[in-house]
């Protein structure tokens, strides 16, 4: 029986109409495609993908809170997303579910407590200062490459605390980019797999995945032979022991978690910082206030600075790196007027709820002050999901915020920027990446 007849399913696209009409927007820009559909159907709509897969896309706050927090035990990561992304990046925390996810989360969580992370702060600050000392200046500078390289070097050094050869870093970066591009095209074009018999694209990408894992395995092997103790995330993963057995993770499990940390740990921060600079470049008052903060406070105190945090939050509100997330219902469920069967995939569209007039005043305007109370202290906002929500809240959120605070403090102490008038183009991959960010950059120091 058609689920639309038995349940209360939001209006949306059938398989045929999805392919013929909606899909052309997804191929160009997933965020714009979903936004256009929200304008047509409202805050929640549905789509039936090939294979009779029912997907509900929502930017309704109560719906998002229900699936991610209030009734989270009824939801796992969707098989569709795990098959597509997990096939490339492994079964780490970002893609696993159920008892295995909980086991891994409990095992790894202690390594991300604030006191543990503070031991990595000096690594982050050293990398930030070195990068900004050589930061490109001039007219219409594309700031994405140096910031992406910085974020990548920070996560690699935090993971491994060794200087990897430049060629290895470049190879890892190229592999990640190619793997992401492949996965997103696969998800946005449901019939694309039919072309593989002619193109062998899937086999090419599997070879990329295998090469990536081989590089990680070599690094782990070298570390096991090294008698020194390192204050890095790899040592934490190698030394972690399961409570019930006292056993360590296997190399494959460690590689899964390393790949997830690399994927989430550099893409999200690099993207957010680039979006942030592109917005602040058009707001001289915000830039001046950041300069004053940077010149009158210590960089290590920036983590607790309310204004710096507010600027970062506002950037993540307007351009959330994690612009949506998925869950699959394990049993029939419903929210408000909607009811849907088990195996329904729910896509929580953070980008949309972050710009909803129901929750934000002047939602399309860059206003960091909205995150401050009357006393200038940082406040929490209910319709704000920069790192997800519920038990699966990003495990590295504190590390990411610290890294971004250090960068913002150091950047505006050293540099000033202005807009070129060219808006960055959104490039939604696994994260929301800017295609290019062209700014006029001048050095203060």
Predicted feature residues:
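Cytochrome P450 proximal C-terminal region
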Residues: 7, 38, 128, 174-178, ...
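Cytochrome P450 catalytic-domain helical core, especially the substrate-recognition surface
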Residues: 2-39, 53, 61-65, 70-72, ...
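Cytochrome P450 catalytic-core helices
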Residues: 266-293, 398-413
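Conserved cytochrome P450 catalytic core segment spanning the I/J/K helices
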Residues: 22, 45, 86, 113-115, ...
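Conserved cytochrome P450 K-helix/beta-meander segment immediately N-terminal to the heme-binding cysteine loop
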Residues: 348-375
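Conserved cytochrome P450 K-helix E-x-x-R motif and the immediately C-terminal K′/meander segment
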Residues: 21-42, 214, 218, 299-336, ...
């Amino acid at each position: 029986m058609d689920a639309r007849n038995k349940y209360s399913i939001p209006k949306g696209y059938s398989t045929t109409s999805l392919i013929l009409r909606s899909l052309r927007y997804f191929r160009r820009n997933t965020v714009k495609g979903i936004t256009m559909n929200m304008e047509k159907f409202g805050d929640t709509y549905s789509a039936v993908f090939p294979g009779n897969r029912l997907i509900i896309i929502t930017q309704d706050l109560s719906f998002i809170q229900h699936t991610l927090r209030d009734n989270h035990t009824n939801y796992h990561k969707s098989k569709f997303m795990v098959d597509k992304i997990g096939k490339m990046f492994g079964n780490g925390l970002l893609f696993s579910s159920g008892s295995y996810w909980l086991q891994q989360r409990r095992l790894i969580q202690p390594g991300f407590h604030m006191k543990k992370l503070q031991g990595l702060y000096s690594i982050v600050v050293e990398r930030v200062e070195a990068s900004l000392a050589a930061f490109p200046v001039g007219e219409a500078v594309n700031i994405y490459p140096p910031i992406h390289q910085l974020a990548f070097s920070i996560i690699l050094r935090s993971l491994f605390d060794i200087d990897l050869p430049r060629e290895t870093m470049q190879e890892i970066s190229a592999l990640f980019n190619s793997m992401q591009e492949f996965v997103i095209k696969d998800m946005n074009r449901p019939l694309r797999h039919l072309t593989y018999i002619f193109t062998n694209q899937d086999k090419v990408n599997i070879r990329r995945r295998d090469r990536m894992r081989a590089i990680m395995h070599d690094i782990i092997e070298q570390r096991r032979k090294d008698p020194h103790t390192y204050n890095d995330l790899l040592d934490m993963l190698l030394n972690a022991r399961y409570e019930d057995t006292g056993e360590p993770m296997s190399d494959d499990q460690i590689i899964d978690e390393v790949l997830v940390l690399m994927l989430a740990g550099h893409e999200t921060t690099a993207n957010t910082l680039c979006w942030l600079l592109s917005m602040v470049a058009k707001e001289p008052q915000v830039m001046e206030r950041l300069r004053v903060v940077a010149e009158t406070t210590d960089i290590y105190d920036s983590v607790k600075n309310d204004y710096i945090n507010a600027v970062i939050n506002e950037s993540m509100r307007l351009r959330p790196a994690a612009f949506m997330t998925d869950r699959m219902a394990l049993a029939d469920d419903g929210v408000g007027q909607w009811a849907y069967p088990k195996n329904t995939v729910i896509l929580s569209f953070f980008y949309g709820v972050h710009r909803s007039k129901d929750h934000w005043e002047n939602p399309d305007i860059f206003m960091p002050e909205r995150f401050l109370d009357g006393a200038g202290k940082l406040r929490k906002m209910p319709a704000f999901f920069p790192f997800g929500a519920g038990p699966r809240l990003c495990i590295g959120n504190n590390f990411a915020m610290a890294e971004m605070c250090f960068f913002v403090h150091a950047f505006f102490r050293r540099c000033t920027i202005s807009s070129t008038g060219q808006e960055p183009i959104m490039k939604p991959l696994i994260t929301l990446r800017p295609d290019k960010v062209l700014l006029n950059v001048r050095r203060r120091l």
